[in-house]
């Protein structure tokens, strides 16, 4: 979107680049600019069309340098009135948009410095002009000369004002600091030879040596170290010059610093050493250099994370390999009790996991309260899961209670993580390795039912999952598997075919008597609101929930195929009577049930729910086998 500015009877669109000019103005300046433009529009009379005037080349200084020595007006008034804020802004941006006046002349001191005019500076000094007075940013001409790298001007000012050599700007920057930042080595050397203090820091406590390391300027570092700059000075984060050079993998600078007395075990505010920085950022050459100079390979930060742990977390494989070759301890845990193997499994880095497996203590893993299997399964890292299982990690190691409490469902097994992620392959891997599907507070089978994944359900049931699972925190009088499958009749029938017990659905406490009011929507999803034990929910109560009640008839019809002579309670009868097409269901429930049906139930009960899958092996006619398996319901 552009802003339109009216100029003498015509409009010119200003794009977003020009509009961005105003972003640096304060609210008061914007108001002033609007007033000036409004007054100009009112007083401007009809004139011929203006022509664009080319402006002179605009040399913008890097800083504001108002070397104003007197508040008195100039001897000769300007030829025209000074520009308002609006015209000044637009003039600064482009001379092609508006007719502008000549720009204000550059301060002669700054002009002389930028042009390297030593004679002009000497003349000013001889004329008595004070060049040791700072501007509003605290900058001296000495700072300008160092900033622009004008060695001749710098020497003139040094000789004239030797007491200003270490004077600081408002940002606590010395001329030496500015020369280092701008990498003007001749100015840097001149200042040091003149006695400049090399360890004066800016507001962030960064010294010239630190900035030289930041810019990877080895020659500047060498000069500063030769003039006794403190190689162990710390910035406000506690970082030394060696920390900075290590983070940039600058071996030449590191060599100079260590030769100049830099401590390889210096720690920042988080107890991080240069070697820790090298491992964390994957700087292998720097890491080798520090290890060669005696740095502690097992250094730990304030949160107890080791250099090896950080390298694993950031997946620096070559760094991990080097640290292990130097004897790094893979059994140092961080403050959360996690080992490098844990974080490598979480990241899913197969190669790092393979390197850590032979050197990781199983005892330390058990003490951590969480298995790498949990982390690999949680993040769907199947290759890592296979490696851990091949290394014979206990597939049934539970999460520690304090870690299980971090999950709302209080999960404890690696199998549960795989099922929650609907990862069929990982589920099969864990079950084949001996995972117990009945260890969690909430059965993984219930999660699989919620996902509607028949393959996962079949795997769990084939490996012994309890098909009549209940939820201890939400007690029901009937299996929770039925509760979870009610909204999908084909899924409900699948579970009933496999032996789910439907009898409890028709064992109502209230029978033919009056029932309490139907539950409000969502009751069965809510956690208990007080410390009282939750009441046991009857099947008819759950069926009366608004989101389920419209399926009451078909649900009862399916369940009746898997139970014998049962009595429908008054609430179930109400549901059936609410829709005339369901009358046949009520008739179906009337005892006695067909003898063939009762015999089928008797045979299935004798076989047992865990052996239902073996029905095909019975020495019976195929037609009878199909009847027992509910493949022929006629």
From Swiss-Prot:
GO terms for cellular component: stress fiber; ubiquitin ligase complex; Z disc. One of its GO terms (biological process) is protein ubiquitination. Gene3D superfamilies: Ankyrin repeat-containing domain, SOCS box. ANK repeats lie at residues 104-133, 137-167, 171-200, 204-233, 237-266, 270-299, 303-332, 336-365, 368-397, 410-439, 440-469, 476-504. It is found in: Cytoplasm, Cytoskeleton, Stress fiber; Cytoplasm, Myofibril, Sarcomere, Z line. One of its GO terms (molecular function) is cullin family protein binding. Residues 26-45 form the UIM domain. Residues 49-60 have a biased composition (Polar residues). Monoubiquitinated. Pathway: Protein modification; protein ubiquitination. It holds the Pfam family Ank_4. Residues 580-634 form the SOCS box domain. It comes from the Eukaryota. The SOCS box domain mediates the interaction with the Elongin BC complex, an adapter module in different E3 ubiquitin-protein ligase complexes. The UIM domain is required for monoubiquitination. This is Ankyrin repeat and SOCS box protein 2. It comes from Rattus norvegicus (Rat).
